[in-house]
């Protein structure tokens, strides 16, 4: 795959695809983490005389965080201490004229790419390259730099459509992400521990099955709704209230998949021995083998319990590699953040090479000031897709582009 240092960018127009899709509250962006993550790539291109055109999406149609990129341009301007022109167009004549007006070392940001219907659905590269987005923009750009690792599991025109039309190059963030994930995935050092929590149960089951089947993991620690599904699969009763909640979320149909994994790999999958519930507004811990488990009929599980935390902590502290995705419980409420905080603290304190991903995981370590994890991944879904052993369309596009253009490398 092409790296940034492979080309000369002076006076060249570079379409830089990033993922600045950020959490919003009351119509305002509340985290600039993704902006900061791509600054090294942007600065490198500007310092090397590129004319930079930034493309990102924000939210999904009809969602509350679906917005223009005007604020994104302003935030980026402040971080770069340089004007970033907001272009209220994507690939129309106005956008193309603005791109052509850029001088070396100048930067503009296109409108939210998902304002174009072509950018909303996943399609094969062959279809993506036939879109108006690719056809029109390819007339005014020289190179494509892809630094959107968080969207690497998607196959949309701005992400993969230029692969056979223009040289497509990894940005610094993309390169760093791939290196860290591959190091963790293919590591021969044991114990290799996967901590799977949160609400992306289907994806987490695929990860667990893949890494266990390939012999890439020695133990799986579960939390959040992932733990609930595996606990049910082990034959424990989680009570009416929790089963109703899981049914509503469509999680009961995943229990069979969890049972299949346990049939083959039971000793390697650890589930909580106790849980914390919201008992009349307070944290109450329930040991699964005690009579108090009757409370699970009327109260919802909100976190893993203290006994589980200790067991998980002991395993993590001995690990050589830890991959974590998703919180252990409802960390947004302080009384139920204990499991998430203590498990993530153990990862940070361990001597393991550690990778952590997922929006909620990152939010929790930022909220509680946890430092020391080796690599914080910007991509939750992309990271899970990678560890599930599935192809990332953006990586395939980068490889295709390299094969097509390797002879023209400057």
Swiss-Prot record:
Residue numbers binding substrate: 19-21, 34, 57-60, 114, 154
Chemical reaction(s) catalysed: (2R)-3-phosphoglycerate + ATP = (2R)-3-phospho-glyceroyl phosphate + ADP
GO molecular function annotation: ADP binding; ATP binding; phosphoglycerate kinase activity
Listed Pfam families: PGK (PF00162)
Residue runs in coiled coils: none
GO BP terms: gluconeogenesis; glycolytic process
First-listed, main subcellular location of the protein, grouped into a coarse class: cytoplasm
Keywords for this protein: ATP-binding, Cytoplasm, Glycolysis, Kinase, Nucleotide-binding, Transferase
Enzyme class at the top of the EC tree: transferase
InterPro entries: Phosphoglycerate_kinase, Phosphoglycerate_kinase_CS, Phosphoglycerate_kinase_N, Phosphoglycerate_kinase_sf
Location relative to the cell: Cytoplasm
EC number(s) on file: 2.7.2.3
Functional pathway: Carbohydrate degradation; glycolysis; pyruvate from D-glyceraldehyde 3-phosphate: step 2/5
Binding site for ATP: 332, 358-361
UniProt cross-references to PANTHER family, sorted A to Z: PHOSPHOGLYCERATE KINASE, PHOSPHOGLYCERATE KINASE 1, CHLOROPLASTIC-RELATED
HAMAP family reported in the protein's UniProt record: Phosphoglyc_kinase
Complexes and interactors: Homodimer.
Family: Belongs to the phosphoglycerate kinase family.
Protein's name according to its UniProt entry: Phosphoglycerate kinase
UniProt organism field: Pyrococcus abyssi (strain GE5 / Orsay)
Gene: pgk
């Amino acid at each position: 795959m092409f790296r940034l240092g492979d080309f000369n960018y002076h006076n060249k127009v570079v379409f830089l695809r990033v993922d600045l899709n950020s959490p919003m509250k009351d119509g305002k962006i509340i985290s600039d983490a993704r902006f900061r993550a791509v600054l090294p790539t942007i600065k490198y291109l500007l310092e090397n005389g590129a004319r930079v055109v930034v493309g990102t999406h924000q939210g999904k149609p009809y969602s509350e965080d679906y917005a223009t990129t005007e604020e994104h341009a302003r935030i980026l301007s402040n971080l770069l201490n340089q004007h970033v022109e907001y272009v209220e167009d994507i690939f129309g004549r106005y956008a193309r004229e603005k791109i052509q007006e850029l001088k070396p070392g100048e930067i503009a940001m296109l409108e939210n790419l998902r304002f174009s219907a072509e950018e909303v659905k996943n399609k094969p590269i062959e279809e993506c390259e036939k879109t108006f987005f690719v056809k029109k923009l390819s007339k005014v750009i020289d190179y494509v730099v892809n630094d959107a690792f968080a969207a690497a599991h998607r196959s949309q025109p701005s992400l993969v459509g230029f692969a056979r039309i223009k040289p497509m190059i990894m940005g610094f963030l993309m390169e760093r992400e791939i290196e860290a994930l591959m190091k963790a995935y293919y590591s021969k050092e044991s114990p290799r521990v996967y901590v799977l929590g949160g609400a992306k149960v289907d994806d987490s089951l695929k990860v667990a099955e893949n890494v266990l089947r390939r012999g890439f993991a020695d133990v799986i620690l579960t939390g959040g709704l992932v733990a609930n599904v595996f606990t049910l699969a082990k034959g424990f009763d989680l009570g009416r209230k929790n089963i109703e909640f899981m049914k509503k979320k469509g999680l009961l149909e995943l229990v069979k998949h969890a049972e299949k994994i346990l049939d083959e790999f039971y000793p390697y999958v650890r589930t909580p021995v106790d849980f914390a519930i919201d008992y009349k507004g307070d944290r109450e811990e329930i040991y699964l083998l005690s009579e108090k488990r009757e409370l699970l009929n009327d109260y919802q599980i909100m976190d893993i319990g203290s006994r589980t935390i200790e067991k998980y902590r002991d395993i993590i502290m001995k690990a050589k590699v830890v991959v974590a995705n998703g919180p252990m419980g409802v960390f947004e409420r302080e009384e139920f953040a204990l499991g998430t905080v203590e498990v993530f603290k153990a990862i940070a304190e361990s001597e393991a090479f550690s990778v952590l991903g997922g929006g909620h995981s990152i939010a929790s370590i930022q909220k509680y000031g946890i430092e020391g994890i080796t690599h914080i991944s910007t991509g939750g879904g992309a990271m899970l897709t990678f560890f599930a052993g599935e192809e990332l369309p953006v990586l395939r596009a980068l490889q295709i582009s390299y094969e097509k253009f390797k002879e023209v490398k400057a």
